[in-house]
Amino acid sequence: MIRSYRQRGHLIAKLDPLELLKSDYLEELHPESYGFKKEDYHKKIFLDGVTNKQHSTIKEILEFLREKYCDTIGYEYMHISNPTERKWFRDRVEIADDFQFTKNGKEAILNKLIQAEGFEKYLHTKYVGTKRFGLDGGESLIPALEQIIKIGGQSKIKEVKIGMSHRGRLNVLANVLQKSYKRIFNEFAGEINSTSEDGAGDVKYHLGASSNREFDGNSVHVSLTDNPSHLEAVNPVVLGQTRAKQFFHQDKERKKVIPILIHGDAAFAGQGVVAECFAMSGLPGHNTGGTIHIIVNNQIGFTTSPRFARSSPYPSDIAKMVDAPIIHVNGDDPEAVVYAARIATDFRLKFNRDVVIDLICYRRFGHNEGDEPSFTQPLMYKKIRSHPSPVKVYGEKLVHEGSISKDHLNNSIKKFKDLLDDQFKNAKNYKPKIEWFEGTWSRYKPESCLLYTSPSPRD
């Protein structure tokens, strides 16, 4: 029974914030399947250290297993062939008592959620109908990324390379890479134009950025790679950049530079380049020491429901080809999301292997903000329109448990809104600089990129 929970407990975990998915009754997760009767539930059983206990009752074992494997996090690690890795993961789930957050930690998570949600709402208000491919519904991604970078800094990581498509990119740029809000507002207003020196002229949700982030006195250089609209095409580019950075850092152990790839659920399961990158991940000439994959699983691919988009239960199933552990987590529980990021980062740093976080959330608006999603998913969007935002869910949880006051929550939201108002006011006069000719590239000078066409033989 204990083994069944380790293998299949995720199938009845509370992973869907919309509660659209109904869990099946699984006989192997019930004591009756193993010959136990109701009157046996309070009898002591000798466990010999299994679940880190010598003796326990059936009732206590069930409570323990359901808490660890069937709450807002579901784990898949029993498919891992390496017994050391499998035991490490099992002990981390069952024995480690680190799924706890201090008052300051909870406030830090809340503040990142306020930034993520407040930024999307502000753009939605100021630039109605403008494409931004918002993160609305998946805002827990932001505190998760913060956690990965923070742990990386504590582990003396020098650089983090991030690759992602357009969904949520502006939010990551602003609230993780610290690209100024006024610059993004300036781009929305159409004030920034491509010059003959930069030759860019790309849409704002394709652009990259880089910055130095400091956590607890540790500095980490974080960069987000530019990408095209072609989903997952950026993956091999990020992995190649990571490998090159490791070379220049003389990082033979692959622990100074780590890649993070952020995927959509439909693209992760459907795009062949994902499987190709997994297939090459263990090769000596291509190995980067493991990638942290985060699937922003909003349970829809443009207008396609999951049951019409893939043949496997989860979009993450393709990762089992390389024995990658998979952590499924409910996006409406930001503490669980941050904890999942913590485990994933620790696993990658210890074993130098790929790991996947399946962040199950939803997409509050259409594929882009000009679409009306209720035409193709009427039942889903009826549910979404009445569903509270992550800030409301988590903020009320903290107020209820006494971690913060209602006034503190409202003041934090207002303070961030005031900051955005100030940035919006100054956006029109913002003067950008060509940042990609700095640092290592400072000895190179931009050439004119004005289009020139050679005369053809017919001219």
Segment roles from a protein language model:
Residues M1-L141, I157:
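Extended, charge-enriched "interface" segments that sit outside catalytic cores
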Residues Y5-I45, G49-F64, T72, S180-R183, ...:
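Glycine/aspartate-rich loop-and-adjacent alpha/beta segment that forms the canonical ThDP
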Residues H10, I149, K156-K161, K256-I260, ...:
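Beta-sheet entry/capping signal
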Residues L123-K182:
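Active-site pocket-lining segments that scaffold enzyme catalytic pockets across diverse folds
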Residues K161-D323, I327:
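Cofactor-binding active-site loop characterized by glycine-rich and histidine/acidic residues
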Residues F215, Y314-A340, S386-D407:
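Conserved thiamine diphosphate
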Residues P306-A309, D323-R353, C361, F365:
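Conserved phosphate-handling catalytic cores of large alpha/beta enzymes
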Residues Y452-D459:
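Conserved small/polar residues in nucleotide/adenosyl-binding loops
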